[in-house]
Swiss-Prot record:
Recorded coiled-coil stretches: none
Quaternary state and interactors: Interacts with the RNAP. Has a higher affinity for the core RNAP than for the holoenzyme. Its ATPase activity is stimulated by binding to RNAP.
Ranges of residues in domain Helicase C-terminal: 492-668
Family of the protein in this entry: Belongs to the SNF2/RAD54 helicase family. RapA subfamily.
Domain of life: Bacteria
Residues the entry annotates as binding ATP: D177, E178, V179, G180, L181, G182, K183, T184
Organism, scientific name: Vibrio vulnificus (strain CMCP6)
PROSITE patterns reported in the protein's UniProt record: HELICASE_ATP_BIND_1, HELICASE_CTER
Keyword Transcription (UniProt): yes
The name this protein goes by in its record: RNA polymerase-associated protein RapA
Described function: Transcription regulator that activates transcription by stimulating RNA polymerase (RNAP) recycling in case of stress conditions such as supercoiled DNA or high salt concentrations. Probably acts by releasing the RNAP, when it is trapped or immobilized on tightly supercoiled DNA. Does not activate transcription on linear DNA. Probably not involved in DNA repair.
EC number: 3.6.4.-
Protein encoded by which gene: rapA
Motif (DEAH box): 280-283
Amino acid sequence: MAFALGQRWISDTESDLGLGTVVALDARTVTLMFAASEENRVYASNDAPVTRVVFNVGDVVECQEGWSLKVEQVVEENGLYTYLGTREDTEETGVALREIFLSNQIRFNKPQDKMYAGQIDRMDNFVLRYRALKNQYEQHRSPMRGLCGMRAGLIPHQLYIAHEVGRRHAPRVLLADEVGLGKTIEAGMIIHQQVLLGRAERILIVVPETLQHQWLVEMMRRFNLHFSIFDEERCVEAFAESDNPFDTQQYVLCSLDFLRKSRKRFEQALEAEWDLLVVDEAHHLEWSQDKPSRGYQVVEGLAERTPGVLLLTATPEQLGRESHFARLRLLDSDRFYDYAAFVEEEAQYAPVADAITALFSGVKLADEAKNQITELLSEQDVEPLFRIIESNADEESKAIARQELIDNLMDRHGTGRVLFRNTRAAIKGFPVRNVHLLPMPIPTQYTTSMRVSGMIGGKLAPEARAMKNLYPEEIFQEFEGEESSWWQFDCRVNWLLEKLKAQRSEKVLVIASRASTALQLEQALREREGIRATVFHEGMSILERDKAAAYFAQEEGGAQVLICSEIGSEGRNFQFANQLVMFDLPFNPDLLEQRIGRLDRIGQKRDIDIHVPYLQGTAQEVLARWFNEGLNAFAETCPTGRTVYDQVSDQLIEMLASGSNEALDDVIAESAKLNQALKADLEQGRDRLLEMHSNGGEKAQQIVAEIAAKDGDTNLVSFALSLFDTIGLNQDDKGENAIVVTPSEHMMVPSYPGLPYEGATITFDRDTALSREDMHFISWEHPMIQGGIDLLMSEGVGTCAVSLLKNKALPVGTLLLELIYAVDAQAPKRSGIGRFLPRTPIRLMMDARGNDLSGQVEFESFNRQLSPVNRHLASKLVSSVQNDIHRLIEAGDQLVVENVEAIRQQAQQEMQQSLNSELERLQALKAVNPNIRDEEIEAIDAQIKELNGYISKAQFQLDSLRLIVVSHN
């Protein structure tokens, strides 16, 4: 190692110091000054951990003054190099740059430059980088991209709808599933896919004010999508950053009332150019042909300006035909322009439904049914399919022929592409509800306080008095003070304590209307019996609620009881529990359904017990009996409840306010009759055809099977743990499928993407993640994995390595060079390039003669035979064979050209095949189904042309390389 003053070297152990200059020499030591980091280092001359920096012809080097030189010749004189070449800014030729004037901040971006400069990575980092490239490639190509990473059970109809809609260009659809079937999750899955595929970058969600937090939590917990709630206060704050506050965030959540009441904010929202608009509870938007409501006009204005629109609404039958038409008008006003024409067209779908029902049942088709199908599919020859169905062919062939006919008929179904609707009746897997009504005597303390309250509270409106009478404990506290212990004598509390003691192993969810009741109940359980309980109410932050929910979910040492207030429990689901206690009752049937829906959801494994303790002779008894006998709302979902309530509310409020229940039997009888009639109408209006289409049948099951197979991916676990190790995260295995990940002091970057400052508990198991809301569900799509991979790539981790191969069959010193190339098409994400040509790794294994052995030498098995080399020795090995490495890279560059051409051709072929078949299908359908929008066809046509250009220009570059040297010891 010969040093000379002015030479440039780089430290092998501290590469972040920059480029060093030899400033002093004596017999035994050498001093280097690193000007970029203002540090000096003194090393022993005979064994300094530094590498000489030499650039080659073709490299571009930077001068300290900031200009760059393309090297055409390298001259050495007295141990110092001078680079001759052309300046890139002025194009002046024959410029000489002495090495002492090279920029101190020089960075080695090419992997071979890093290798020559001694900046050699650990072998396991090289392996991690290659695996990251390979896995990213496979994830991008997967047809299930965007569906695997959400924290939700694998429920066929939800996944089918998300898969159908999420891949469309600017989807405009109506999601009208019945309550408890997970419309919010379907919408979230569609949003998630649109975001991952680059189709939607700016998203606006408009919901009723009470549901804002529920949406915020669901999007964050289930899909790792961080929305910002916008209200007047937030808009005023954001005004400092931008004239239009809506431009300050990509994902915005706001209430319809906020936009309805402020014309200024509505106009700003209109100007903000969204890619996707999501509207929840869209059935509350009132419309009539001559007088649409303000709320409807707000949504209509946004829907006209936004390419993608998702409307979440109650079932069409609950809405009524005209109201249902009004929702469809928001999606496509050209198509749904006239209500009368819509009604007439709907009537024509009856024969389609009959034909499909006949095909579904598998019975022999009558001539009439065949004629109907032939007429409906007039543009294609269906005779061969009929022949297969009626022949002696095997069952599978018959099923395929039937399915083809069904698919073709479905496509022609008027609203099949814009409307998805599932019912509990059409979807199996819901638990039975066991109802336990428990009448209890009213304590004398309550009787007294209620009588006094009635005497002095004469000014209250009937509705307010009715509400007040439902909560006798509050009336008692008005007289006895906030601190009075009503829970010492209330028989509902005594009953609850006995129940909890009798069923120690069962998790119990208790819901009370008020936060104060919930808090006092927790105190009662703790003080009277030492029962482990936790509370959940609207006064708590999202993080506090998460902790409470996690404590309740915990198997070992968790809370036996979770006590929720009405608002606090919105949007939270506790499917792992099956015992529900309603400590009091809500005022309206929708809230009752929402309470039961905390446990009675798709995915609940057991039947659920609903316990309703109520005080006899009080408003509670009136309500309990009306819900039970008038609506049967405890035992079954009650889509008609609200309508019945609106009809009988005056009599009901009168009884609740007065405490008299003489007319109760009559009101119950009237309600039951009305309920039956409404339910019969709903059943009559059910669109069987739409249900068949919405639940996805066999196709939905296949999607579930595919995602379930990916769920057990052990590759992901080992990859994630190596990734966290490399970046410098602490990992602590907590058992029960949980690992705690926290930032360390030795991290590669100051903060890790997707990881909170205090760390996070993660799990790779979907079921664990579903029962423990405090855990992150880690999948290939999770920001912690995606962000970690981006970090590896951008920080150049693992781009060059040196390994030893102990193999006595080969001569000592035999060289192999592993080259990893990446083929890349520079294209915007929204173009859809990722589906056909994502960043594609190509691996070559060059022997010393320049032959590629990658076909015979598989990466993982070969990697297991290699051992790492320390950086200093690696640097010496590289220096001794630098010319060979140069030669082999040139040979690799020539060899890889053929691979790149093959990859381009395959991508072109797949893209043409996939998009052209979709285009032809839509064009053929356009002739028979007006629901195909021109924009959709034009978008696919433009996409094909665009992608053709991008794919043909795809380039390759050397991403990483590994030198392998054979040794025998």
